Amino acid sequence: MTPQLRAEKSAAAMWSTDTASQALGMRIDHIAPGAADLSMVVTAAMLNGHGIAHGGYIFTLADSAFAFACNSYNQLAVAQQNQISYLAPGKAGERLHAAAREQSRTGRSGVYDVTVTGEDGRTIALFRGLSRTIKGHHFEEEMTP
């Protein structure tokens, strides 16, 4: 199995039970080994008291992209630590894009950076996630010698 097919099958398996991302209207725009791009439209229900995207929804989009990137090897991985810096507001009706990219993967630990951008390309937030692999796989895979 190619690494790309493994990433696609891992994403499909995760997506099938990821009701949180689905309920928020997220979509997977791109998946590759160690990488994932997700997007989401900021709805009226996602606005805070300032009339801009609530930071929790921006964080959730970034966290979901991170999850799909670190789980792209058919090895279960969970978040160990996350941090985010908000740089610009997300606007009502705007589609936000989260691009997660692997920076390091050694042993059971991984480091992933996620950039959240607005439709015009401006940077909304920078997120860093640390992952840890755990026992289990997303799907059964025959290993060839």
State each model region's role.
Residues 1-145:
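Terminal targeting signals and extreme-terminal segments of soluble enzymes
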